[in-house]
Amino acid sequence: MNFISTLIIALILRILYLVYRKRNPSFYTVSLVIISLIVWSVKSYLLDYYIIPTSSMAPTLKAGDLIFAKPVDAQKEQLMRGDIVIFRAPAFPSFIYVKRIIGLAGDTVTYTDDKSVQINGRMIGQLNLHNDHTSTYQALQERNAQQYEYVIDNRKPFVKPIYTQWVIPDGYVFVLGDNRDHSWDSRFFENAVGTPRHLRGLVKKELLISRYLATAFTLEFMKSDFDIGENSLKVISE
């Protein structure tokens, strides 16, 4: 949990403690209004919060993780490869997804039948661990030069995507889940009716809501992935 989130929680707990000590109905009302304003302000301008319901971003984000994210202005935010973003699904805006940015404007993304992903001809990541079940790769985030892992399920057959190569135009990003064989992402996304064929699977920057910052804690009762369907991997935000 980062400093800001700790400070906010401490402030709310302090208010609740004062409410308990006062035990005055009018003080209850004022305190609830203050807490509501704090939560609204934080969510609107400083931090977003979400609960992850599936394992599509494992091992980075697990089912049951409560995460904090920074609201983004798609026109001003400098996005980088490796950023984890929360966004509205291209064809179903009521669904909210969380994925990792792999390709930016000007990139050529290639997905091969051995499940590897290349950016401008260079493979993403290096093999770290391999067994009969999974292969784990390590790759680098551009923003902080830290490593992250993504996983390929060796038991799953190759599923042909809508395309095997995308050229990313201005205003769009290409996203993938870290749990590659258990993620519905730019390889398979449907887009709104009328979207040109070469844009299928890509996510408009204007659909981006926020950028992942940190994981606060894991809700134990949600640790087992209750997958609600590969077509509706929804992040609960309200």
Please provide the spans of the model-predicted regions.
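Internal/C-terminal transmembrane anchor helices
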Residues: 25-46
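N-terminal signal-anchor transmembrane helix
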Residues: 46-60
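Soluble "head" domains of membrane/secretory-pathway proteins
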Residues: 2-23, 59-238
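Short hydrophobic alpha-helical membrane-anchoring segments
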Residues: 11-18, 40-48
